[in-house]
């Protein structure tokens, strides 16, 4: 089994898992709170990262099959764009994790004021 096929499979599973998280939050009214909004943000970042890796693996597979010229202009540009988007997705995931950590901090140390500090309006702005 080729590494591209393994990464392709893992990326597809990652997209599906994050879609399940998004659907669960969207369908269940009890999960539509600021904390779950942050989790959705993380799921979207992770899903985009998986999608970019799927695109990159498709390019590699097409190159290995002879449909793309190795290190041609299109492949190099597409690979650079995909890598840049993947890094942006990674930064989005790190930011989402930081916001989730801040939300948990506020929940623990400012429990009585949590709902006045963390509002949906502020959540959307973040």
From Swiss-Prot:
Disulfide bonds: none annotated. Pfam families: 7tm_1. GO terms for biological process: adenylate cyclase-activating G protein-coupled receptor signaling pathway. It is found in: Cell membrane. One of its GO terms (cellular component) is plasma membrane. Residues 56-80 are extracellular. The chain crosses the membrane at residues 1-25, 35-55, 81-102, 124-126. The keyword Repeat does not apply. It is a multi-pass membrane protein. Residues 26-34, 103-123 are cytoplasmic. Its main location: membrane. GO terms for molecular function: melanocortin receptor activity. Keywords: Cell membrane, G-protein coupled receptor, Membrane, Receptor, Transducer, Transmembrane, Transmembrane helix. Belongs to the G-protein coupled receptor 1 family. Interacts with MRAP; increasing ligand-sensitivity and generation of cAMP. Interacts with MRAP2; competing with MRAP for binding to MC2R and impairing the binding of corticotropin (ACTH). Receptor for corticotropin (ACTH). This receptor is mediated by G proteins (G(s)) which activate adenylate cyclase (cAMP). This is Adrenocorticotropic hormone receptor. It comes from Papio hamadryas (Hamadryas baboon). The lineage of its organism: Eukaryota, Metazoa, Chordata, Craniata, Vertebrata.
């Amino acid at each position: 089994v080729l590494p591209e096929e393994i990464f392709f499979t893992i990326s597809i599973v990652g997209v599906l898992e994050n879609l399940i998280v998004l659907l669960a939050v969207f369908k269940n009214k009890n999960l539509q709170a600021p904390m779950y909004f942050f989790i959705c943000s993380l799921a979207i970042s992770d899903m985009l990262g998986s999608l970019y890796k799927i695109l990159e693996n498709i390019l590699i597979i097409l190159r290995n099959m002879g449909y793309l010229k190795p290190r041609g202009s299109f492949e190099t540009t597409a690979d650079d764009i995909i890598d840049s988007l993947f890094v942006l997705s990674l930064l989005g995931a790190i930011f989402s994790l930081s916001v989730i950590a801040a939300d948990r901090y506020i929940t623990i140390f400012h429990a009585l004021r949590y709902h006045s500090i963390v509002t949906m309006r502020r959540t959307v702005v973040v």
